[in-house]
Amino acid sequence: MLTIAIPKGGLLPEAIALLQQVGLDFSAFLDKKNRQLQITDPTGTARAMLVRTHDVPVYVEYGQAQLGFAGYDVLREKKPDVANLLDLGFGGCRLSVAVPKASPYKNPRQLPPNCRVASKFVNCAKDYFRDLDLPIEVIPLHGSVELGPITGMSEAIVDLVSTGNTLRENNLEEVEVLFHSTVRLIAHPTSYRANRHNMLDWVQKLEQIL
């Protein structure tokens, strides 16, 4: 049976709505009383696993799910061995460098060598500043990255931005966009090549409604 890894949180409703358009109903995940992490479509055609956003590519890479919905930001950070098949067009955001509004640095290239940058996206931040040939120390954080500059722990942050409201409320401003991100359909490469569980048919159905 085809298994699809879908992300918890804000991306879940749109992921479920998209799957409903191709005949797969996992809306039970939207029931607040639901505690199941894996459910089967009422037709018995496929099952879905509800996992954390950053874990979607892990389950796909290791073959526990044949398909998954993963943010491009997660794929850039984790660099998993998966096939990136389709841009699903929702969950739009961008990964940006931000500094305090009062900062004298209005461009990442102006940051002093060996300064500190706080981020959840450690690999993306390191890759970006390496390309600039600017040595920096990346401080890994898992939440409230904005506190880095506020507390003086870092001169800048690299973080996801959607509306920019959180930055503004914390007196931070974007100075550079690293890349834009949307949710992608990913697949386990070997399963996809072998067309396990008619994966190609489902991918084509999704492609047709985009």
Curated annotation (Swiss-Prot):
Its EC number is 2.4.2.17. Pfam families: HisG (PF01634). Belongs to the ATP phosphoribosyltransferase family. Short subfamily. It comes from the Bacteria. Catalyzes the condensation of ATP and 5-phosphoribose 1-diphosphate to form N'-(5'-phosphoribosyl)-ATP (PR-ATP). Has a crucial role in the pathway because the rate of histidine biosynthesis seems to be controlled primarily by regulation of HisG enzymatic activity. Lacks the C-terminal regulatory region which is replaced by HisZ. This is ATP phosphoribosyltransferase. Its main location: cytoplasm. It catalyses: 1-(5-phospho-beta-D-ribosyl)-ATP + diphosphate = 5-phospho-alpha-D-ribose 1-diphosphate + ATP. Keywords: Amino-acid biosynthesis, ATP-binding, Cytoplasm, Glycosyltransferase, Histidine biosynthesis, Nucleotide-binding, Transferase. GO terms for biological process: L-histidine biosynthetic process. PROSITE patterns: ATP_P_PHORIBOSYLTR. The keyword Glycosyltransferase applies. Pathway: Amino-acid biosynthesis; L-histidine biosynthesis; L-histidine from 5-phospho-alpha-D-ribose 1-diphosphate: step 1/9. Heteromultimer composed of HisG and HisZ subunits. GO terms for molecular function: ATP binding; ATP phosphoribosyltransferase activity. It is found in: Cytoplasm. The gene is hisG. HAMAP family: HisG_Short. Signal peptide: none annotated. One of its GO terms (cellular component) is cytoplasm. The keyword Transferase applies.
